[in-house]
Amino acid sequence: MEIWQAIVLGAVQGFAEFLPVSSSGHLLLLQRLLGVTEGGLFFDIMLHIGTLIPVFIVFFGDILGLFKKPFKKMVWLIVATIPAGLTGVLLGDVIDKQFYSGTTLSAVLLSTTFLLTATELFVSERIQKQKNTALPLSLKSATAMGLAQSVAIVPGLSRSGTVISAGCISGVNREENASFAFLMSIPIILGAALVSGLDVIKGGVEIETLPIIFGVLTAAVTGYIAIKVMLKVIKKANYKWFSLYLILMAIVSISTKLIWEI
């Protein structure tokens, strides 16, 4: 992988991780377009780690709050993490095999999940604007957000979009919905990084150090910008432009694959 490719992928990861457009789906599509094949999944995980840096910066106070009595939010975060953790362990390899295979089926699957995210955002916007409730976060809503996150391990389904939508439907107030959704990314990304790191130790993945460094730094900077933008978007509950963009990406995913096979 060239350094410029790593920077491009890092920028895409940083923006797409926190905007509701699916970072894994974008990385998968872009890696295919750039011809990046070696260590693609491991590089993807490392870029996700890069996006954790701005989460710690922006939500430092919220993270400290997890360790204060009565530890209610910490318990909710653990509960919200369990579904995605189990899904990743049980189905992670199957999902990766289907989506990272480079086949026409993988392109169709990615297009489908992009469209599902577009639909989800459209429905979420309608619900959020119609509901007048602004409930505090609860165990019930945290569980709903956790179940939503377990579905969003599939490339093309936006983790942030899916989780925030679940919070919206549960009636959680926008500020708590946003902060908890971003906090939920921490254990999931760290867990995925641990699994990927074990694969590297076993010698299954070739590491390209310099591209990874540039990619991670780029992801951190663009991720910070994306978080600030997304916090404003959530306050206005205006997701329609993201829905339209995802429809376009669904078309790009399937059309580029079909064109290459002609």
Model-based region annotation:
Residues 1-262:
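Multi-pass membrane proteins that catalyze or facilitate reactions on polyprenyl-/lipid-phosphate substrates
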